[in-house]
From Swiss-Prot:
One of its GO terms (molecular function) is structural constituent of ribosome. Component of the small ribosomal subunit. Mature ribosomes consist of a small (40S) and a large (60S) subunit. The 40S subunit contains about 33 different proteins and 1 molecule of RNA (18S). The 60S subunit contains about 49 different proteins and 3 molecules of RNA (28S, 5.8S and 5S). Part of the small subunit (SSU) processome, composed of more than 70 proteins and the RNA chaperone small nucleolar RNA (snoRNA) U3. Residues 233-264 are annotated as: Disordered. Component of the small ribosomal subunit. The ribosome is a large ribonucleoprotein complex responsible for the synthesis of proteins in the cell. Part of the small subunit (SSU) processome, first precursor of the small eukaryotic ribosomal subunit. During the assembly of the SSU processome in the nucleolus, many ribosome biogenesis factors, an RNA chaperone and ribosomal proteins associate with the nascent pre-rRNA and work in concert to generate RNA folding, modifications, rearrangements and cleavage as well as targeted degradation of pre-ribosomal RNA by the RNA exosome. Keywords: Acetylation, ADP-ribosylation, Cytoplasm, Differentiation, Isopeptide bond, Nucleus, Phosphoprotein, Ribonucleoprotein, Ribosomal protein, Ubl conjugation. GO terms for biological process: cell differentiation; ribosomal small subunit biogenesis; translation. Pfam families: Ribosomal_S3Ae. This is Small ribosomal subunit protein eS1. It comes from Callithrix jacchus (White-tufted-ear marmoset). SMART domains: Ribosomal_S3Ae.
Amino acid sequence: MAVGKNKRLTKGGKKGAKKKVVDPFSKKDWYDVKAPAMFNIRNIGKTLVTRTQGTKIASDGLKGRVFEVSLADFQNDEVAFRKFKLITEDVQGKNCLTNFHGMDLTRDKMCSMVKKWQTMIEAHVDVKTTDGYLLRLFCVGFTKKHNNQIRKTSYAQHQQVCQIRKKMMEIMTREVQTNDLKEVVNKLIPDSIGKDIEKACQSIYPLHDVFVRKVKMLKIPKFELGKLMELHGEGSSSGKATGDETGAKVERADGYEPPVQESV
């Protein structure tokens, strides 16, 4: 007889028993995502995170999460082609307090503006706000026909393009350099910077569809809870402790005994 395991006998043993299926969502909690006070609608959604367990704290898993939300959802408007990025900077109870992290135009809007028979002019600039945020702003604009123009095309000369680009950079630098982040975001919501550029460039060549198409966050200053609470309109005095940071579970061996102290 061949020496070896009899597979038929061991088939119904412990090895073949199915593991108990645990629902992964039973170990997770829902947190509300709160937008800063610049926007009309503050509660923008919920996010999921694994509960605090041992040294792994739930709020640490939430900090740094980036949420991309359409401006239509912020302002309760049907038509909006701007997307704002918000980053979680702190967790208070079951609320994730976010801050501005960037802006972008939707792809369909960008594609709808690019057409034949006109010149597309783009510019970008790196600017620092008064409260220490370094932003990179991208601007785009398109030439349009003069009044009473018969010719089909409206192409700008290279010299005019350079002048318009210079004007774009000047206005973007001026608008951001003299304001803090909150005021810059308030200007980005209606895109007053794009309208200012359009007015200023009319004397060089008539423009239309002038937008700040993208804003990137390059550097942020050291985190201050007081400033974040001001952005959320809750004042600087906030002594709330995070609900999940009450204590961390410490693993001990079964036969663990504390060391004997020589003196008390």
